[in-house]
Amino acid sequence: MGDVKLVASSHISKTSLSVDPSRVDSMPLTEAPAFILPPRNLCIKEGATAKFEGRVRGYPEPQVTWHRNGQPITSGGRFLLDCGIRGTFSLVIHAVHEEDRGKYTCEATNGSGARQVTVELTVEGSFAKQLGQPVVSKTLGDRFSAPAVETRPSIWGECPPKFATKLGRVVVKEGQMGRFSCKITGRPQPQVTWLKGNVPLQPSARVSVSEKNGMQVLEIHGVNQDDVGVYTCLVVNGSGKASMSAELSIQGLDSANRSFVRETKATNSDVRKEVTNVISKESKLDSLEAAAKSKNCSSPQRGGSPPWAANSQPQPPRESKLESCKDSPRTAPQTPVLQKTSSSITLQAARVQPEPRAPGLGVLSPSGEERKRPAPPRPATFPTRQPGLGSQDVVSKAANRRIPMEGQRDSAFPKFESKPQSQEVKENQTVKFRCEVSGIPKPEVAWFLEGTPVRRQEGSIEVYEDAGSHYLCLLKARTRDSGTYSCTASNAQGQLSCSWTLQVERLAVMEVAPSFSSVLKDCAVIEGQDFVLQCSVRGTPVPRITWLLNGQPIQYARSTCEAGVAELHIQDALPEDHGTYTCLAENALGQVSCSAWVTVHEKKSSRKSEYLLPVAPSKPTAPIFLQGLSDLKVMDGSQVTMTVQVSGNPPPEVIWLHNGNEIQESEDFHFEQRGTQHSLCIQEVFPEDTGTYTCEAWNSAGEVRTQAVLTVQEPHDGTQPWFISKPRSVTASLGQSVLISCAIAGDPFPTVHWLRDGKALCKDTGHFEVLQNEDVFTLVLKKVQPWHAGQYEILLKNRVGECSCQVSLMLQNSSARALPRGREPASCEDLCGGGVGADGGGSDRYGSLRPGWPARGQGWLEEEDGEDVRGVLKRRVETRQHTEEAIRQQEVEQLDFRDLLGKKVSTKTLSEDDLKEIPAEQMDFRANLQRQVKPKTVSEEERKVHSPQQVDFRSVLAKKGTSKTPVPEKVPPPKPATPDFRSVLGGKKKLPAENGSSSAETLNAKAVESSKPLSNAQPSGPLKPVGNAKPAETLKPMGNAKPAETLKPMGNAKPDENLKSASKEELKKDVKNDVNCKRGHAGTTDNEKRSESQGTAPAFKQKLQDVHVAEGKKLLLQCQVSSDPPATIIWTLNGKTLKTTKFIILSQEGSLCSVSIEKALPEDRGLYKCVAKNDAGQAECSCQVTVDDAPASENTKAPEMKSRRPKSSLPPVLGTESDATVKKKPAPKTPPKAAMPPQIIQFPEDQKVRAGESVELFGKVTGTQPITCTWMKFRKQIQESEHMKVENSENGSKLTILAARQEHCGCYTLLVENKLGSRQAQVNLTVVDKPDPPAGTPCASDIRSSSLTLSWYGSSYDGGSAVQSYSIEIWDSANKTWKELATCRSTSFNVQDLLPDHEYKFRVRAINVYGTSEPSQESELTTVGEKPEEPKDEVEVSDDDEKEPEVDYRTVTINTEQKVSDFYDIEERLGSGKFGQVFRLVEKKTRKVWAGKFFKAYSAKEKENIRQEISIMNCLHHPKLVQCVDAFEEKANIVMVLEIVSGGELFERIIDEDFELTERECIKYMRQISEGVEYIHKQGIVHLDLKPENIMCVNKTGTRIKLIDFGLARRLENAGSLKVLFGTPEFVAPEVINYEPIGYATDMWSIGVICYILVSGLSPFMGDNDNETLANVTSATWDFDDEAFDEISDDAKDFISNLLKKDMKNRLDCTQCLQHPWLMKDTKNMEAKKLSKDRMKKYMARRKWQKTGNAVRAIGRLSSMAMISGLSGRKSSTGSPTSPLNAEKLESEEDVSQAFLEAVAEEKPHVKPYFSKTIRDLEVVEGSAARFDCKIEGYPDPEVVWFKDDQSIRESRHFQIDYDEDGNCSLIISDVCGDDDAKYTCKAVNSLGEATCTAELIVETMEEGEGEGEEEEE
């Protein structure tokens, strides 16, 4: 490989990169330098400071040097060189001179190579001379207007090409297929050309170009390294052109070469190729098209004109040029070049003379008036993303401008080189503000305080200039000097101002609590009027003022507080402005509030037109940010939205800046405006997007700015925290208890921090408590006091990121009082500034901020507001959608479709099945409407109307996939009824419906309805549509039909009359009667006028009432309407028409109309309207429905992760979130009775009954007959039997269980069905009883002269209630009767005072709250005193703890030839676990007793795991470790023969009644544990599952223990860096959870946890669930604060402290543990103070309860040995009922073995998830349903999450996920729409791993050709 040199140069900069070939071979060890953030060219004013900065990477660390004219630059004088951490570097040139201009070369070198980048410094004035053009420097404060638009093309004319979807980067493996796809629009149909680099691609065997479903597709089969490069899709038509590029790269390609693309295989030693890299603004074909058509790439001479510059093409009209400019994508990236041959390639960018432009373009407003703030025009720059190596942004600063030469060189806009800073000072201090201003001519500087000029005053204020700086000096600051100061610099070019604040703190003054000297007064106003609320407040310090409306913070009004007078100004009052206004005043001593009621009377409709245009307030006001920017931290590749809310009169104009440079709208940066809200959307952030973002707003009255820092972080594995359900703001009274709840998610599970007013809550106060139920966290404030009020913040953190949410707690009727000093007062600061939305959701520290209420003047118009006379030109930057739609709104004829659509459509009633059979006649016009509207790219979450409290921020933070054109969720094919306008209105981004407000997306086929605002919407007039649509779009004919044409019939319907146009006056006819009810005349034709006199218009006798309903409860709305003829009823929710579905039942019985929803969801909240229509007119009434959140205990986990559920949960049939328009039926003669799906109107609650009692379960049903009722249990239909009876009737069904037994427990489901649908309900039945007898045979051990220890098993079933105690009964040979001996709680008892000449038998009964069980089996006859010689278990040979018995260590090989039954007698079962079962074995030869661990191993992987465990145990021959002595394998069965230990688990032994726990015993146990683990570590092995269950006592009397269960053990030696992701949450170390390398110290953490619990009975990290436990472990926070540690020695605490270190390097090892002073203590002579065992008992009870959860548990556990009994060598003479076989009944040993193996219950082994059935690609028709089915295997049961492209799917009525007990998983998508066309992925995860499968859903919409030919021609 030869040297590679890449050079890119222009008239501004030159960049070159070199690669040293000698370093390539050593790439894995070293890395050549690479500029990951290269420095940029600068254009600086003379005298200013220039700073080149960038970032370089490489290994070793590269050295950065700077050169100019071949000479190195050294740091000193005006030049400052700096190299920072992580490769950052900079060159700073102070006081730039003319001679400093020129090119600077930055070189980064290390041992692996060198890189260079050349940049250019242009000093203002020199640049113009160099190019022969005047230059306009880009400064922070200057302005320019959008170009003027004098003429516009016809609305039906040509449209330049556009990209509707983005071309994404493709990364494939070599040999795979690479696929690029994008969607384009334009008229006429654009011609598509694909290029690689600049060379057009020709179809071949490997390269195919096609169009699929409107997508342009390029496929490259068998990708190799020659195919790597940048591919461009070029689209051209007669109206313009557009192009978009993306890179194809091969996965695994050497990282040093990945930044280049091999473009040619040159054989020359030197090849020089020059290409142009300039954007042409011409709308006709330029060089790129010419290259595509001629397939040649000409090479112009350097410095000359490009080849197309000489073409004498006619100058295109200015408007075409403007549209082309607007529509053009961002600058095509420079083509990177990959060189692998022995040659040198230079890529040179040619210089292009800028195109002349008409002077003054864009300076005038539409009315021709000059702008009030003139500013020199500035060229638009198009930031180009080039994350590749050494990329540059090359921008022609003077392109496309023709500026007169005169006066430009000698003038410059004012600029602040340095600005005054905000200060806080004490009274009487001297304050000095300094600023430095530049500009030509020299600007004049003026100072202002709160808008009032500040002038020099002798002895107090000095204003002067010194050494080029301007100063304002306050000699003695007073409190009255506090406020906002501003400085204005102005010259002939314009003016610029900046502002800051001064806070002068009063010296020690007597503090006074707030109080009102005058309070608010009630008032009444007429809609549209302004009003002011005023009160006087006093207090020291000055109280903070917060205004509330109906208890919620006000976001849109202007408030002032001057001289103790607080005022709230409401302009242009709306009906929703009425309510209770509260002024809340607070300071450090307390808070006080006063309230007033404001009534807003509606205007008469005759004056409706008066407020169609906003009334401009008379007094200009400077801009104010109601919501500013806040700092953001996001992941690389995330989508970010920054939103501000700004008010002012006239409406301010806004620009966005990044690090002081103005941001231009491009493919990556979008600007959006919704009324007073302005947003900057970054589609995909890169590290170079890090920096300070500033939003600057100005109008004629002043300007203001806000800024924040965006930090782009490298991605981590996992998911950033987010709120499943957000908390709500709370208003409470003194003394009440308050709950603030939220549900959270994240991976790893986040830690939760609660803060008030920015400070962490202190747990020591005792006034609050934080509760957790799985992922639901609740803050409980008991008996709230005034100091509890304030802003509460919930901060979530994990290693991926953090998220926060704020809510406010406000107190009602607080009396002013002084608080004790030191008490922290509440703070309600930020409430007005948008800190908390009206829904209480709070502001999230993410890029996307949800609006609360609509801003003032906004209504529901997103892009039309505020444009009045200023029009499009006044707007700072237009969004991309302002092309033909913006023109169309001005010229299209306004048409009223109500005449045709509202009546005279004869239809026939069709069922859904009928509709699906006639798709050819059912024409869906939405497909055509959708193509006319080209919406912006929005996230999937923004398209959905979701609850204010449930927002999924992953759509912001996750890496986005290919952008798709959003389409609202659609409905089945339209029936012959009112057409659906949602596809027009839904094309624009919707406002989320919040606080009961509505997106109001549809007009209900009546444009007039849009004039009535919904909820908080501002009246916007009948001609203004809702959402983001233009008026012309709203009223545009459907399907591209001509406006004057007859509407195409839908279904079999034929319209009776032609579409008639309506005047604007007719559209405005709309009469309001009262607030909640509206009646109007629908007709404008003669026929309709005649029909009015033939009947009575509808009227509501009973109106709808506002409703509050809890989530999951039934919602019922009813109203009564009278009319003649009978009216047709239409229901709408938030403007969307409802229809009967499986979830929503609409009914009409006579005059009673109702809506019924069985289980209300958050999406059911909003404004419901009932519209009644007949020929005589129409009426409507409405109500607001609020769906309150379910209680915290009912909140579920993150909805997108779905766990397998039992068969009892039947999937409900899906409904739709966005339902179709209701059919319009002919006016019936008699009121029809609507057919209804079945409803279950009565059903029992969960029941608990005693065994033997009878149970009746009755469900009452209603609906259209016939209805079939079916009872099921666990998804299987219940068959009648002697115990169960089913009785069905017309109105219900009853299930009777005559005598309930334990097997009748479970979940019962009643399924009711008719032809219209189905419904189901479930009830849980619990049968309680006395417990079963204790299992097995009681066993006597430790037999002495007059005592013994009796032990037994617990009951196999506790009867539905926990066993409370055991009753022990005794039989002796003298009395020969059974009598009760004692009662105890544990499963062992020490029996005393036995006589040596008697024989005894024992039996045990279990007792719970329902009674006493039958007795257990009888023990064997036992005598005390001298025991006969008999074989003994070696573990019982000696109780002397100091002497270990002899152990027969064996190296085990697995016997595959013989069976376990050949050598051992298999006796009773001792226990079972997930691995299999444990049986007692007696060796035939020696009669020794062993334990047999029987595994079921079905796969090779499972067998290998068991073999690995045996192999590890062969290395672990130590007295403290349980020994494996034999092993057998036969087919799927593996048996390990193990040493038996009978003392039970260590902690079970400790809580025995007869055990005395002291610190001495703890030392003995910990010493043995350390010895055993030390030996394990010396063999190079880690245990990884140390926990109490795996520490077994040798017997029930001594203190010797053994460690068991090596199923998770791993060899560390030779393993390199080992990472695992398993263990028991409570005992696992932080590095395991974080998936970091583990070591021997990982076991030491577990030892520390065991020791902590052993000495205290408390667990340091146990939470209420595993997620909380894992979070506690990750944070590694613990203490000895509990009183349990009062009795523990300091040595013991020190021992624990040195083990529970988060950094594993700082933990003790086993050798150090054994040498620790605590374990070195003399246990024989030390003081033994008894420790309490109560906490240990509670801990064990809690741990047993927790084991029923879904913890990440270890495999292969031998903890069941805790219940081993019957340790004597004799076989039971009677046999054991629990034994798997009875040897006497079997004929041969072979039968014995076979019968045993069959008896071992097949328990599932642990298996990584896999798909036994995968999802398949689907192709469906729009409007139908799609279903993906798969089957998932794995154990533990995998959890499932579905993805649409890269977005996780949350279950809703549109997406339903079903996952049953058998592993069948389905995703059902109802009412499929074009937006559902995507790739779907099912991901299954359990503790062993994950699996995914993917399929594509293709949605067929109408053919592209249909409707296209019907465009209007003028």
Curated annotation (Swiss-Prot):
Sequence repeats: 868-895, 896-923, 924-951, 952-979, 980-998, 999-1003, 1004-1015, 1016-1027, 1028-1039, 1040-1051, 1052-1063
Annotated stretches, region: 6 X 12 AA approximate tandem repeats: 999-1063
Regulation: Isoform 1 is activated by phosphorylation on Tyr-464 and Tyr-471. Isoforms which lack these tyrosine residues are not regulated in this way. All catalytically active isoforms require binding to calcium and calmodulin for activation. Repressed by organometallic pyridylnaphthalimide complexes, wortmannin, ML-7 (a synthetic naphthalenesulphonyl derivative that inhibits the binding of ATP to MLCK) and ML-9.
Chain residue ranges for the region called 5 X 28 AA approximate tandem repeats: 868-998
The UniProt record lists the keyword ATP-binding: yes
Domain Protein kinase: 1464-1719
Induction: Accumulates in individuals with asthma (at protein levels). Induced by tumor necrosis factor (TNF). Repressed by androgens (e.g. R1881).
Domain named Fibronectin type-III: residues: 1334-1426
Phosphoserine: residues carrying this PTM: 305, 343, 365, 947, 1438, 1759-1760, 1772-1773, 1776, 1779
UniProt-annotated catalytic positions: 1585
Primary subcellular site in the record, as a coarse category: cytoplasm
Residues making up the signal peptide according to the UniProt record: none
Localization per Swiss-Prot or TrEMBL: Cytoplasm; Cell projection, Lamellipodium; Cleavage furrow; Cytoplasm, Cytoskeleton, Stress fiber
Cofactor: Mg(2+); Ca(2+)
Biased amino acid composition, Basic and acidic residues: 318-329, 1054-1077
Disulfide-bond pairs as recorded: 182-233, 435-487, 535-583, 742-805, 1119-1170, 1830-1882
InterPro entries: FN3_dom, FN3_sf, Ig-like_dom, Ig-like_dom_sf, Ig-like_fold, Ig_I-set, Ig_sub, Ig_sub2
Feature: compositional bias, Polar residues: 331-347, 1413-1422, 1770-1781
Catalytic activity: L-seryl-[myosin light chain] + ATP = O-phospho-L-seryl-[myosin light chain] + ADP + H(+); L-threonyl-[myosin light chain] + ATP = O-phospho-L-threonyl-[myosin light chain] + ADP + H(+)
Assembly notes: All isoforms including Telokin bind calmodulin. Interacts with SVIL. Interacts with CTTN; this interaction is reduced during thrombin-induced endothelial cell (EC) contraction but is promoted by the barrier-protective agonist sphingosine 1-phosphate (S1P) within lamellipodia. A complex made of ABL1, CTTN and MYLK regulates cortical actin-based cytoskeletal rearrangement critical to sphingosine 1-phosphate (S1P)-mediated endothelial cell (EC) barrier enhancement. Binds to NAA10/ARD1 and PTK2B/PYK2.
Entry-linked PANTHER family: IMMUNOGLOBULIN (PTHR47633), STRIATED MUSCLE PREFERENTIALLY EXPRESSED PROTEIN KINASE (PTHR47633:SF3)
Stated name of the protein: Myosin light chain kinase, smooth muscle
